[in-house]
């Protein structure tokens, strides 16, 4: 391969990486605006994160709080079933965003696949906000249900 070909390949890679970063920054700006517009109140925002091999429910945050401040939770369904379980379609709501009613119990729950303890969120109600919400993960594969890594929102 000639030096010119190598230089072109390098510049194309840098250019494409820059485009991806610009797209991510633009998505984050839109997301920040929508979060800032949320009404304060006695509710939570939840993003379902389904993994075939894990038992976590997803990320939960307070209104007007960034997704980077959210917590990955285990859902207590003794009062209300999780939306996908209520529909008898486990995982069908992967990456769906919800307005959640409920509270953190103060307890942690062991999740065996990750060998971690996660906060317990007691669900008392929910409402779908969006089935196709803005991306909160840098990696576009973060919502793949077969993925063995749990990504953290940014």
Predicted features along the sequence, with ranges:
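Bacterial N-terminal signal peptides that target proteins for export
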Residues: 1-7
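C-terminal motif of bacterial Sec signal peptides marking the signal peptidase cleavage site
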Residues: 15-18
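OB-fold and OB-like single-stranded nucleic-acid-recognition modules
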Residues: 20-154
